């Protein structure tokens, strides 16, 4: 009888799922929100000192600093 009670208590304790914050970890999100060889950042609008280079998904822009922009034409 004692082992049955112990088994039931362990089952109840192990089945408890503690509440957690939903969403991804901020460090993981920062890695996946980068673009262009981890030099750009995916945003809805670029800041003043940044320029838009490519799209990130459907709605976001890949914003790069001007010094990180690749050379498009070589003369």
Curated annotation (Swiss-Prot):
Q: Which cysteines are joined by disulfide bonds?
A: 35-62, 42-56, 46-63
Q: Which cellular components does GO assign to this protein? A: extracellular region
> Has UniProt tagged this entry with the keyword Nucleus?
no
Q: What is its main location?
A: secreted
Q: What UniProt keywords apply to this chain's record, in alphabetical order?
A: Antibiotic, Antimicrobial, Defensin, Disulfide bond, Secreted, Signal
Signal peptide per UniProt: 1-22
Q: Where in the cell is it found?
A: Secreted
Q: Classify the source by domain of life.
A: Eukaryota
The Gene Ontology biological process annotation of the record reads: defense response to bacterium; innate immune response
Purpose of the protein:
Has antibacterial activity.
Entry similarity comment:
Belongs to the beta-defensin family.
The name this protein carries in UniProt is Beta-defensin 30
* Species annotation: Mus musculus
């Amino acid at each position: 009888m004692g082992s049955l009670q112990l088994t039931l208590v362990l089952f109840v304790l192990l089945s408890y799922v503690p509440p957690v914050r939903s969403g991804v970890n901020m460090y993981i999100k920062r890695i996946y929100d980068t673009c262009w060889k981890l030099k750009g950042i995916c945003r809805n609008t670029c800041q003043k000192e940044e320029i838009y280079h490519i799209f990130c998904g459907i709605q976001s822009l890949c914003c790069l600093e001007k010094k990180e922009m690749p050379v498009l034409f070589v003369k």
